[in-house]
Each structure stands twice: as structure tokens, then as C-alpha cells.
Amino acid sequence: MPIFRLPREPAFPDPALAEPDGLLAVGGDLEPERLLTAYAEGIFPWFDAESPILWWSPDPRLLLDPAALHVPRSLQRTLRRGTYRVSADQAFERVIRRCAERDRPGQQGTWITAEMVEAYVRLHRLGLAHSFEAWDGDALAGGLYGVSLGAAFFGESMFADAPDASKVAFVRSVEWLRSAGVELVDCQVRTEHLVRFGAREVPRAEFLARLARALEQPTLRGRWQLEAAGPPS
């Protein structure tokens, strides 16, 4: 199948036309309207500094039902000890920059380019991209960020500078998302790390159907507060 070159307007081809590896289209920009259109259609950007903007819709898709969250026993002990304090939207830009700096086994460089950082900071200022932070005292020990639309949360990346910090942030974030009415967490592609927490692969068509239902719900827009579920302030 051909790889589509995006037009100037924020429109995308049918995800069913993606390559076997999930690559769907190339080009366009990272303006908020295009990013939000992409997420609403089950498409996300992923590229490195040496590549043009690439857009993906893999099949199968990894997702987590917040109600199906599994917490490994060893992590349950860490949570009970209260080693880390978890917050939301307290340090978004610091979180995304640490995710960009994180070394990943078998990967040279980062896909979170300066252009990507700027794009998601813009979404954060619009109240549509959010971070969860794990703190060890006053030190940022780990965290994650993603995008919220309707009753869906699209996880993007996480980092840890201390043992289990990102795992604690992830568990607390999913617990909060569930209490706030979020129906699915998009984990994009399979990793054994996320499978251990209850994520599972589903056919792209099933993911898109569930996403469409989730988008019928209102978006939790604004600054989130972890201490209280429901609509943010």
C-alpha cells in the first residue's frame, strides 16, 4: 500500500490503509488541530530528528481498560510504603523533557524531538495534555504524560530516575483515570512492561470502535488534581 502524504488541511486517510507495521502517512505538522484530529482517529505521530513527521495506526493495538489494572505484588509493597508522592499536572514540561532524555535499550537518540516537546506543551496549555509525577521529597523521581480526549487517555511516554517511580506514577494515574470516568488507556504498541499491568492487544478495528464510544463522553479539560476525581478545575 502507498504511504500517504498529508495535505495542508488536518485530514488523514483511513487507518485501515496503514502499512503492516502501522505506518499510515507522512508530512503535515504538529499543530493542535492536526494532533487532536489524529488522536480522535486512532493515529499518533512517531519519528526521530532525522525523519519527516510520520503517522502511525498499528494493528493490533495495545490498550488498557482501567478496571483491568493489575498491580504486581512487589509493587503493591512499594505503594503501601508510600515511597513516592504522586501528583498531576505539576511539572508537565519537566516530565516530557526527562522522557526525551531517557536512554532506551536498542534505540539511538529520541523520538521526542524539540518539535514534539513544543507541540505537547501547547496541548498542555490548552488543557488537553497531562502529566503525572512521582516525587521523592522535592525531587522529581519519575512520571508520564499523555493526551486526554473524551473518555480516552492516550499514553505517550514515561521515565524513572529512581526505582519503581514511573510504575508508581502509572498505577496512581490509571486509578485516578478510572475514578474520573476514563474508559480506555491507549498504550499504542506492545511492551511486556505494560502487559504485566493488564494491558492487552486488540485488533485495530476493535480499538477504533471502543475509541469512538469513548469520544462520545466529555473531555476532562483543564488542570488535573490527583487528590480529587471528576472534572478538573
UniProtKB/Swiss-Prot annotation:
One of its GO terms (molecular function) is leucyl-tRNA--protein transferase activity. It holds the Pfam family Leu_Phe_trans. It is found in: Cytoplasm. Gene3D superfamilies: Leucyl/phenylalanyl-tRNA-protein transferase, C-terminal domain (3.40.630.70), Leucyl/phenylalanyl-tRNA-protein transferase, N-terminal domain (3.30.70.3550). Its main location: cytoplasm. It comes from the Bacteria. It catalyses: N-terminal L-lysyl-[protein] + L-leucyl-tRNA(Leu) = N-terminal L-leucyl-L-lysyl-[protein] + tRNA(Leu) + H(+); N-terminal L-arginyl-[protein] + L-leucyl-tRNA(Leu) = N-terminal L-leucyl-L-arginyl-[protein] + tRNA(Leu) + H(+); L-phenylalanyl-tRNA(Phe) + an N-terminal L-alpha-aminoacyl-[protein] = an N-terminal L-phenylalanyl-L-alpha-aminoacyl-[protein] + tRNA(Phe). Keywords: Acyltransferase, Cytoplasm, Transferase. GO terms for cellular component: cytoplasm. It is an enzyme of class 2 (transferase). The keyword NAD does not apply. GO terms for biological process: protein catabolic process. Its EC number is 2.3.2.6. Belongs to the L/F-transferase family. Functions in the N-end rule pathway of protein degradation where it conjugates Leu, Phe and, less efficiently, Met from aminoacyl-tRNAs to the N-termini of proteins containing an N-terminal arginine or lysine. This is Leucyl/phenylalanyl-tRNA--protein transferase. It comes from Anaeromyxobacter dehalogenans (strain 2CP-C). The lineage of its organism: Bacteria, Pseudomonadati, Myxococcota, Myxococcia, Myxococcales. The gene is aat.
